[in-house]
Amino acid sequence: MADENLQPLFQIQRVYLKDLSLEQPNSPAIFLEQEQPTIEVAVDVGAQPLAEGIFESTVTITVTAKIADKIAFLVEGKQAGIFEIRNIPDEQLDPLLGIGCPNVIYPYLRANIADAITRAGFPPVHLSEINFEVFYQQRLEALAQQQADNSSGIVMADGSAARH
């Protein structure tokens, strides 16, 4: 019976849309444009503990569509999930929160973003799959580089390195 309490546990408690905003600063004139828009996509991932063994993981996507120098639309969505994670070794917890949880959350966010764009009157934008493992590794490398650039080892409140 005691062994059951030590078994690794990864369980989805809830997946929810935390934030969704849409801006169309140049409508209705932008609907008369014949050019295809250029699409830019930005991604961010976050996680925070809520209670012992309970974590919130988030994926944020910002999609900006421009025609020439005019913004056709800007959509930002943040999908979140609450996960129960217990008896996972510390060295596996961060990758689980940075890779595993976003893989669960992202399909919901992708559908919500696509729905918001089409409901705004624009052709659908199909967001591609994201390899969160590569994304996680890139974030680790950027953090390591930032720490290497920080000669004093002191980081100021704004995230910049302290200067002597």
Curated annotation (Swiss-Prot):
Covalent S-S links between cysteines: none
Gene3D superfamilies: SecB-like (3.10.420.10)
Subcellular location: Cytoplasm
Native source organism of the sequence: Janthinobacterium sp. (strain Marseille)
InterPro entries: SecB (IPR003708), SecB-like_sf (IPR035958)
Name of the protein in question: Protein-export protein SecB
Presence of keyword ATP-binding: no
Subunit structure: Homotetramer, a dimer of dimers. One homotetramer interacts with 1 SecA dimer.
Gene (UniProt): secB
